[in-house]
Amino acid sequence: MGTTPTTATAIEVAGLDCGYEGRAVLKNISFTVARGEIFFIIGGSGCGKSTLLRTLIGIQKPMAGQVSFSGQSFSEKDPAMRVKLLKTFGVLYQGGALWSSLTLRQNVSLPLEEYTRLTHIEIEEIAALKLAQVGLTGFGDYYPAEISGGMRKRAGLARALALDPAIVFLDEPSAGLDPITSRRLDELVLQIREMFGTTIVVVSHELASIFGIADRVIMLDQGEQGIIAQGAPRELAKTSRDARVTEFLQRGDLLPQ
């Protein structure tokens, strides 16, 4: 898939239990993500993909275990380190999470205003650059309601890239998009990895994206409350002896040859 990931570790998850209201949804989750890797978290509805993502980015506190970024533990016990680490990754939420009352340029500017001491002119220049990097040159003064769903996803991605993060998390980026628009977004994700060496973690159930751009995946299962498979998706589809894995990856007409 383009740039070869390095052997250096960008994310390490060890013995993670996560859930809500005192109930564990996932138990003993352990995996690593290499720098520059496009890594997918996959599985059926209700398996805990979004719960795991929220725990990785710090929205939810883990019930047990540890998440580390480049060897540094992401812990609420160290607020200064937590803020430092928050600056090293960007997030594209499922709906794009753009403020409807702000233009695209203003939306992309928000992280820069929050986390940097750049001047207004510098922030404007960076926001325009990030919009250009996702193919939205000339759309800075548009509001989210004035553009298509695919363009809103691109604008959300531009905001996620505003601080030049080492890691970007994408939550169901293809949701609500037609197949052509979804494929174009996949191509953009590949371009971002190629240009910047960004580590990209994607929550998805879309087979076209899984087979199209993922270097490796972990598959979650609701019944197991954990990981039931991990590896390259094409290899898993061909060689896994777990019916849950093959049934998920061999849906539709996208079985890899």
Where do the PLM segments sit?
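Conserved ABC ATPase signature
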Residues: 143-147, 151
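Catalytic Walker B motif of ABC-type/P-loop ATPase nucleotide-binding domains
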Residues: 168-171
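Helix-to-loop junction immediately C-terminal to a conserved catalytic motif
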Residues: 57
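ABC ATPase NBD coupling module
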Residues: 74-90, 120, 236-240
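Conserved ABC ATPase "signature" region
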Residues: 120-139
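A short, proline-enriched helix->beta-strand linker immediately N-terminal to the Walker B motif
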Residues: 162-166
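Conserved ABC transporter NBD signature motif
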Residues: 65-74
